[in-house]
Every structure is written in structure tokens, then in C-alpha cells.
Amino acid sequence: MTAIQLIVGLGNPGPEYEQTRHNAGALFVERIASAQRVSLTADRKYFGLTAKFSHQGNDVRLLIPTTYMNRSGQSVAALANFFRIKPEAILVAHDELDLPPGVAKLKRGGGHGGHNGLRDIIAQLGNQNDFHRLRLGIGHPGDAKLVSNFVLGRAPRAEQEKLDASIDFALGVLPDVLAGDFAKAMRELHSQKA
């Protein structure tokens, strides 16, 4: 069991993207920072907002890239390389079109599934895709042509409440995730639905 040393929350920078579906991962990391009572601060060296807390004697770093989504890997690779964090000790939280709002799933490895943030992270980590993912369901607009506007849009209140609930579920299993007990975390998280 590999303990998680880096949690990344994907999103786009700037007030125009706050509370959009595409920023679900960033929202998750903001909630962790709040729960741990640490402040995310800008760090140019890592192209993002960073914070650190301790869990069972281990340092856990938080990162929200301040690059645009399709350059997220630049930020992740800079921090992971500096602190010598291996891909299997990284958890990337991101929005997931293929899951309905209110559903969160953990996964290790795999492709990018069309997600530009994941695509760039895989490329910047030297084509290593063995990092963990927290997939936060946002639903699908039903037509591929509508995806861009959909992910960059704000969810209606009922959808946002479901997304918030799925983030709460994920926060509930975070101690198991941090300890590297993904089997236990997955059993618990995958049985939840808002």
C-alpha cells in the first residue's frame, strides 16, 4: 500500500471559471485545505496553489494548478519531480462526464478518457499513467458538440448539491486513501450516491 503524498485538484484559473463543472477537482482540494486548516498559496515554481499538511506522520501536499486545464501536467510534474513523488503516490481529482452528478469513484491508472487535464499530466509524467484518480461525476450533456460549453458552465443548484455531496463522500474516505488502503476506500465510496 502506497501512501498518497500529493493530491491534485484540476480546474481552470480565474473568477470566470469558479464553480464551473470543470473545476470540481479544484473544489475538492479547496475543501481538504479548509478541513486541514491550511492555506493554499501561489507558488510560481509549481505553477499552482500549494499547501502541505501532515497525516499519520507523513507530509501530504495539495496542488491546484493555475495553468489552464490542458497544461495541468506542467504543474503536477514540476512539484512531483522536485519532491520525488512517484505517480502511484499521486491522487488527481477531476470532473467526470461519464458519471452522473452525485457519484464519485476512485480508480488507479488508465487512459485520459478525453480529459485534457489528465492527457497533459500523463504526457508530462513521461507517459506514466499509474497515478490514482478521484472521478467526480458531473453528467454528460448528451451530445459531444455540447461538452465544452457544458463543462465550462455552472451546474444548476440541484446538480451542484449532488456534486457537493459526492465531494463530502470522498472526504469521508480520505483517511483510507491517504493511508493507501484503496480497497477499503473504494468499497465505501462506491456504495454512496447522492
Swiss-Prot record:
Keyword RNA-binding in annotation: yes
CDD domains: PTH
E.C. number(s) listed in UniProt: 3.1.1.29
One Gene Ontology molecular-function label: peptidyl-tRNA hydrolase activity
GO biological process, one term: protein quality control for misfolded or incompletely synthesized proteins
UniProt-annotated catalytic positions: H22 (proton acceptor)
Primary localization class, coarse: cytoplasm
Subcellular location: Cytoplasm
Record site feature (Stabilizes the basic form of H active site to accept a proton), residues: D95
Site (Discriminates between blocked and unblocked aminoacyl-tRNA): N12
Catalytic activity: an N-acyl-L-alpha-aminoacyl-tRNA + H2O = an N-acyl-L-amino acid + a tRNA + H(+)
Alphabetized SUPFAM superfamilies for the sequence: Peptidyl-tRNA hydrolase-like
Keywords of the record: Cytoplasm, Hydrolase, RNA-binding, tRNA-binding
Binding site for tRNA: Y17, Y68, N70, N116
GO cellular component, one term: cytoplasm
Cited PANTHER family: PEPTIDYL-TRNA HYDROLASE (PTHR17224:SF1)
Subunit structure, interactors included: Monomer.
Function: Hydrolyzes ribosome-free peptidyl-tRNAs (with 1 or more amino acids incorporated), which drop off the ribosome during protein synthesis, or as a result of ribosome stalling. Catalyzes the release of premature peptidyl moieties from peptidyl-tRNA molecules trapped in stalled 50S ribosomal subunits, and thus maintains levels of free tRNAs and 50S ribosomes.
Family (UniProt): Belongs to the PTH family.
Name listed for the protein in its UniProt record: Peptidyl-tRNA hydrolase
